[in-house]
């Protein structure tokens, strides 16, 4: 079992200075178990939480022996200065889990001290296991400051598909992302060897943010990844043939990782693109059709 470091007594609580912290952590473990069915059943066998971050119960909308769906719940609904969220999930050999969230996450404006928030996600997938990480979109309010890290550790034979959809500011309310700074880090490895490393700093004051060689003034971006496809080239051909034909997205593959990117101005368009890509890729990755989580329909 992964052990969390002890939280200092001043690291979490009601403080309103530069040392303010409010920590929350969630640790999940999934295993494929041979029960009465001839096909193993993926069970949520470990669930530890600290603070306002938890799950209620697993769902099996694809049948008892199908993928185990779990909703990650953060009742506050967003991150403010000093919040520190840590999510860890492990899928053991032969298991199949899907993680999602019930609503869009919100990154609120930093306090007067400029204290940042942090969100750190670590996903571990064993041999012949599958993990789908499909959170709903994240909305960064003007003035938000924080660090988001996503670490995915795969064993040989593991498969994974996931995405991150980020909307900057609230342009419909004439509230653009004009101040603040967000940093995103991705680290995906296979047997300890890096396959995809990426660091992105989103600072509206930097010329890269509006430059055509950078963000180009786009307010919405998305990244979808997939590892474990038998034929990546064929998968790319399917995406190019069936996804909407416009210049706001592109797809490529590198070192066994399929990457689809979106850069535009429409949050719903980015989400729809990722969801449609998932519907196309899932049968190729997991040999089962996509089954939309019920929470997305509410």
Swiss-Prot record:
It is found in: Cytoplasm. GO terms for molecular function: nickel cation binding. Keywords: Chaperone, Cytoplasm, Nickel insertion. The keyword Repeat does not apply. InterPro entries: UreD (IPR002669). Its main location: cytoplasm. GO terms for cellular component: cytoplasm. Belongs to the UreD family. Required for maturation of urease via the functional incorporation of the urease nickel metallocenter. UreD, UreF and UreG form a complex that acts as a GTP-hydrolysis-dependent molecular chaperone, activating the urease apoprotein by helping to assemble the nickel containing metallocenter of UreC. The UreE protein probably delivers the nickel. This is Urease accessory protein UreD.
């Amino acid at each position: 079992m992964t052990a969390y470091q002890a939280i200092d007594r001043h690291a979490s609580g009601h403080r309103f200075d530069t040392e303010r912290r409010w920590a929350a952590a969630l640790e999940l473990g999934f295993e494929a178990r041979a029960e009465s069915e001839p096909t193993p059943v993926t069970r949520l066998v470990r669930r530890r939480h600290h603070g306002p971050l938890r799950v209620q119960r697993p769902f099996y909308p694809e049948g008892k022996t199908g993928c185990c769906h779990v909703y990650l719940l953060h009742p506050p609904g967003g991150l403010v200065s000093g919040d520190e969220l840590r999510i860890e999930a492990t899928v053991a050999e032969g298991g199949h889990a899907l993680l999602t969230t019930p609503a869009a996450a919100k990154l609120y404006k930093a306090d007067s001290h400029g204290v940042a928030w942090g969100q750190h996600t670590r996903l571990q997938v064993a041999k012949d296991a599958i993990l789908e990480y499909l959170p709903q979109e994240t909305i960064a309010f003007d003035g938000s400051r924080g660090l988001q890290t996503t670490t995915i550790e795969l064993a040989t034979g593991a498969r994974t598909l996931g995405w991150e959809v980020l909307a900057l500011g609230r342009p419909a309310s004439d509230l653009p992302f004009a101040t603040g700074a967000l940093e995103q880090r991705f680290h995906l490895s296979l047997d300890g060897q890096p396959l995809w490393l990426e660091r992105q700093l989103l600072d509206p004051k930097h010329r890269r943010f509006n430059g055509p060689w950078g963000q180009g003034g786009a307010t919405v971006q998305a990244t979808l990844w997939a590892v474990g496809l038998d034929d990546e080239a064929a998968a790319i051909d399917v995406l190019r043939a069936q996804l909407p034909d416009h210049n706001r997205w592109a797809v490529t593959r590198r070192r066994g990782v399929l990457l689809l990117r979106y850069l535009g101005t429409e949050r719903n368009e980015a989400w729809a693109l990722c969801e449609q890509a998932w519907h196309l890729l899932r049968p190729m990755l997991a040999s089962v059709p996509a089954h939309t989580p019920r929470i997305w329909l509410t």
